[in-house]
């Protein structure tokens, strides 16, 4: 047999639970909407970085694998120019072209500024003799091949500039691929 009193109490409990669930979802959506609707360029940049870039470059630009560059600590001007080059087709990379599709110039500037403000990565030490050769070429170049010192353009500490990328802390495998 059915107990009308028990059914009424259960119905009230379900209604209360449903109201609380709806309220929690609404509050969560409001909080997400506030972040998504923000006019603060750093918030916008962080949202774009998380949604479009983090899978390959990590949420803070530290890179998730050696074949992807670390973006943290690059200058905003350098990153902006690179993203604009992908958007215009001047720089070719299918994945990057897709990722920048639909970003406005201010979105590109926002994500570039976000990554520029992140702490640059650090690459653990490796083979000391090989590091010594690399340091020599970086500081003095290779006169046999005509390669000028990397430091001439990228700076003594490899921090890069508004025109050239930061090399310090970059994944060695990524640098090798770019040089070749």
Indicate where each model-derived feature is located.
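Short, Lys/Arg-enriched N-terminal segments with co-localized hydrophobic residues
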Residues: 1-9
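Bacterial N-terminal signal peptides
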Residues: 20-30
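The feature marks the first
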Residues: 41-89
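The canonical Cys-X-X-Cys-His
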Residues: 52-60, 111, 147-157
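Axial heme c-ligation environment in periplasmic c-type cytochrome domains
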Residues: 64-70, 85-127, 161-166
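An amphipathic alpha-helix signature
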Residues: 76, 80-84, 105-112, 172, ...
